[in-house]
UniProtKB/Swiss-Prot annotation:
The gene is ribH. GO terms for molecular function: 6,7-dimethyl-8-ribityllumazine synthase activity. It comes from Chlamydia felis (strain Fe/C-56). Its EC number is 2.5.1.78. It comes from the Bacteria. Keywords: Riboflavin biosynthesis, Transferase. This is 6,7-dimethyl-8-ribityllumazine synthase.
Length: 154
């Protein structure tokens, strides 16, 4: 029996981060965490592309542009922050962004991790950005690299 598993190593991996700017400090923490994790896991700065977009809604079209640009990426991390407000805007954006990111990952056969925080409050969002617990930018990069290394074996 053959069991295949990826490792969270960035050595030799070309990776992109598409990070939304909306909800600034939290979004910046996600992108910074993903960047630092890439470097900590053996990646080099010249193999990392960071693209900042205005908001999470702009992530899917930017992913599509990157994927069709001719540049070969091993994985992409999509970072953003959506905080629930009093209107249905949050639900519409969260559902559409998640669906499109997933569709692009399947369509292109490329690991694209969904490191978009969807939270009921600012405090809850900060908890997912490493202040009091998990860090979605870090875990998103680790997962992206693990999947990229697994895909190299398939």
């Amino acid at each position: 029996m053959k069991i295949l598993k990826g490792t969270a190593s960035a050595r030799g991996m070309r990776v992109a981060i598409v990070g939304a700017c909306f909800n600034g400090p939290i979004a910046d923490a996600l992108v910074s965490g993903a960047q630092q994790t890439f470097l900590d896991l053996g990646g080099s700065e010249d193999m990392l592309t960071v693209v900042r977009v205005p908001g999470s809604f702009e992530i899917p079209c930017t992913l599509k542009k990157l994927l069709s640009s001719g540049m070969e990426y091993h994985a992409i991390v999509a970072c953003g922050v959506l905080i629930k407000g009093e209107t249905s805007h949050y639900d519409l954006i969260a559902d559409q962004v998640a669906a499109r990111v997933s569709e692009l990952s399947v369509e292109y056969g490329l690991p694209i991790t969904f490191s978009v925080i969807t939270a009921p409050s600012v405090d809850s969002a900060w908890q997912r950005a490493g202040i009091k617990g998990s860090h979605l930018g870090v875990s998103g990069m680790e997962t992206a690299l693990e999947m990229a290394n697994l895909f190299e074996k398939l």
